[in-house]
Amino acid sequence: MNRKVSKFLKDYRVILLIVLVAASITAISTMGIQQGLDLQGGSLIQIQLERPVDAATMNTVTSVLDKRLNIFGVKDVKVRASGDQNVIVEIAGVQPDQVADIVGKPGKFEAKIGNETVLTGTDIVSVQPPIITGNEWEVPFRLSTDGARKFAEAARGKAGEPVKMYLDDRLITAPEISAEVATGKPVTDVRITGAENSKAEAEVQAKEIETLLKSGSLPVKVKIVGVSSVSPELGKQFAEGAVIAGLLAVLAIAVILIVRYRSPILVLPIFFTTLAELLLILGAAAVIRWNIDLAAIAGILAAIGTGVDDQIIITDEVLSGEGRRTRRKFRIKDAFFIIFASAGTLIAAMLPLAYIGFSRGATGIGLLAGFAFTTVLGVIIGVFITRPVYARFIETFNVAGRK
């Protein structure tokens, strides 16, 4: 027996599995598993651009939105493109009404003297923190040298005329040109001022303007077409439900295997192989920072169920044959022919679902992208890593006579 154990542990497939399981445990413990919004709570905002855009423009849009939300003070933000006309914003632990105004505005700044645009957002080089005094607020910012020069030329000789400052075509303030500025002397330090009904409203308005000025304008107009949220309490309930579902699935599998084989040497290896498969899936998810949500959990359960099916196929093929070594090898080859055919069919069925899911984003059928991805990942891990190890165990320890 000791010689068989030594031979089994020296097999390259077994060594590979042990190394990958150890790496997965390390990845899970150090990197953690990212939970989807339906498990940890948070908000999901779907934004639609006014027209389809190319990859470079889409990168600009997602970059500006990500910058805005970080400046606004929102943590755990994920902004990603969904096709060529939609953007998905995922925010953990934040209600959507707190950030919807920020992500849904173009952020276009203009300053006009008369009907002439004298400043735009591109002329701003830095924005200072807002100053709140009672219900009044001001947001100081600094102009570039070229912007200050353009403004000075436009303001020359126009003392007392208003400088109308617009944000997304909405008039924010209209300070008068001072006598000093009207001389044509460039001024780099400018400020936007205003007043609200309360100090709290003043703080919100000033923070929003600071955020929009700092992040810059979006290259295209956008609109919010979908908003959803899950409270942390509800997310906790979902997570608990998923754990219960997983435990019930394990219990059901255990009952079926015990009833079918009535032998620990047949049942325990299937459980250890299944556990290894689960660790590899979660480890891969931790490394690539893949969100584990309810759909992904369903995919994991489907992959594990498929894995148990495959191990039953291998076991039954060996048990139905004669005890000779050559016969066992042929039986295992027959089993793997069935397993590969089944895996190919399943992957072929999942790929269109994954494609549609990724192209649609995290709404509607897009939620099933997580299901398809984790199912395919689990099947690939099983077929190329865990199934061969289980087959090697069956072959090495000659389970044909142990039923």
Curated annotation (Swiss-Prot):
HAMAP family with a match to the protein in the record: SecD_A
Topology versus the membrane: Multi-pass membrane protein
Domain of life where this protein originates: Archaea
Record localization: Cell membrane
The protein's assembly and partners: Part of the protein translocation apparatus. Forms a complex with SecF.
Gene: secD
GO CC aspect terms: plasma membrane
Transmembrane feature ranges: 14-34, 238-258, 265-285, 294-314, 336-356, 365-385
Protein name, UniProt field: Protein-export membrane protein SecD
Organism: Methanothermobacter thermautotrophicus (strain ATCC 29096 / DSM 1053 / JCM 10044 / NBRC 100330 / Delta H) (Methanobacterium thermoautotrophicum)
InterPro entries: SecD/SecF_arch_bac, SecD/SecF_CS, SecD_arc, SecD_SecF_C, SecDF_P1_head
Function, in words: Involved in protein export.
Family: Belongs to the SecD/SecF family. SecD subfamily.
UniProt record, GO biological process: intracellular protein transmembrane transport; protein targeting
UniProt keyword annotations, A-Z: Cell membrane, Membrane, Protein transport, Translocation, Transmembrane, Transmembrane helix, Transport
